[in-house]
Amino acid sequence: MNRRKSREVAMRLLFQTTLNGENLEEALENLKDVRESEEITKEKDYESVDLKDVDIDYVKRIIKGIEENKEEIDEKIKGNLKNWKIERLSKVDLSILRLCTYELKFEEDIPNRVSVNEAIELAKKYSGEKSATFINGVLGKMI
């Protein structure tokens, strides 16, 4: 199983729930239906994530952990934004920041630099170079 792909699925579920107000529990129930969304990628023929490579238990733990600690996670993000409000962040960037902030704060077995690097890679893939730099700066203040 692949942690990188698992993070990607978790980020996409977070994005989905942030975008359409769907309950995280519903999103987890529909995990088998996860498909690449044109709304979060610039490439229309982008490959979908193969769920056989995904650690579903890890994804569920991350999603549930973020849901249970969302206020604390968002406060941590807000405290590290400079000249930005959390409401102005793109939904993709917010999803990535929530995912990484959760890992930094609650997943002690994952080195901070790994979580930050994975967040930067997700930002490059789904949001762009400027977002990757922005996310790196925000997360760099947290560690």
From Swiss-Prot:
It comes from Clostridium botulinum (strain Hall / ATCC 3502 / NCTC 13319 / Type A). SUPFAM superfamilies: NusB-like. This is Transcription antitermination protein NusB. Involved in transcription antitermination. Required for transcription of ribosomal RNA (rRNA) genes. Binds specifically to the boxA antiterminator sequence of the ribosomal RNA (rrn) operons. GO terms for molecular function: RNA binding. Belongs to the NusB family. InterPro entries: NusB-like_sf (IPR035926), NusB_fam (IPR011605), NusB_RsmB_TIM44 (IPR006027). Keywords: RNA-binding, Transcription, Transcription antitermination, Transcription regulation. Pfam families: NusB (PF01029). GO terms for biological process: DNA-templated transcription termination; transcription antitermination. PANTHER family: ANTITERMINATION NUSB DOMAIN-CONTAINING PROTEIN (PTHR11078:SF3), N UTILIZATION SUBSTANCE PROTEIN B-RELATED (PTHR11078). GO terms for cellular component: cytosol.
